[in-house]
């Protein structure tokens, strides 16, 4: 038996933020990030709508990119003090992911972070509060998913929390918010969405309910992302819907080792002054993982279907896989995303010499590969890698070399 879970309500289209006026409750806590929602006036509007609905409102501000365990614990403490019956998470993937984890801790104060990370092991929520997610970026789709990513900076590891319990009750997908994204964020979140859709389509957990969502999202992203990056606001609006469809697909079909490796490399070199931004990591690793997974006959066939839907040509599946890989690498070029870790600069742009030294990468490689194999996303990958294979694959992602194994 399989399960397909989405938010009960999804409000979409320009002006959808006004849906907050219709909420019923006594207290709402709004969780936000670094200030863009306040700067562009969306936070004040959200507060006004909730007060119009008769609620007392409190803010938890300053959630950092790649939110930490410590931030989650501070937010949960604030919730325990304020006792909201609505948690409103607003912004990009980071504040929404953090708020999901805070929600768990608010409902179960004794739960540990390690217990939260047990895959599909969260006890029933909604005893104290319901959850609304309002996305301002077009990539993570955490507003409709059963996932949250939290970083343990002491270990340098990003941990996925995965459980249908943390699927939001309400999602608000208002493209007005996405129109404020800076160009680099458009690129990274957009390739995150493309990775979600492609991994969902080839996942071992894909089904008749997820396949149409994944394929349609791929086609939309192909048509919209580069133009959105170059300033076409109608395409920016369309991308906001495309990434949400990709999220619906992967939340139910799950993901694969592109995400496993992105999770485990993202903060692994933070002591060298930067992170490998999640969407950029996905963009770099996706072509390599396609080449690796395509050694599996069923996966190769499904990549061929993706290439057909994208109208890339090719007379057989081997040719189609090659054309798909070439197309995705071309998208990275168009979006100014590097092809490998070796040329990933501290500002995330292509650099002659990246910020991760070769000797440091090789020294940490076995541990990174071990952690990636244990990641929650690995189990649904169409080809299960050994420790040796994943180390070789990560080397290909570092040096941009051919995957021939």
Residue ranges and their predicted role:
Residues 74-76, 95-109, 144-145:
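Short Gly/Thr/Asp-enriched flexible loops that form oxyanion-binding sites at enzyme active sites
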Residues 84-100, 136-142, 275-276:
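Glycine/serine-rich anion-binding loops at beta->alpha junctions
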Residues 107-206, 301-305:
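A glycine/threonine-rich phosphate-anchoring loop and its flanking beta-alpha core
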Residues 200-327:
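Active-site segments that bind and position negatively charged phosphate/pyrophosphate groups
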Residues 307-405:
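C-terminal charged capping/lid subdomain of soluble metabolic enzymes
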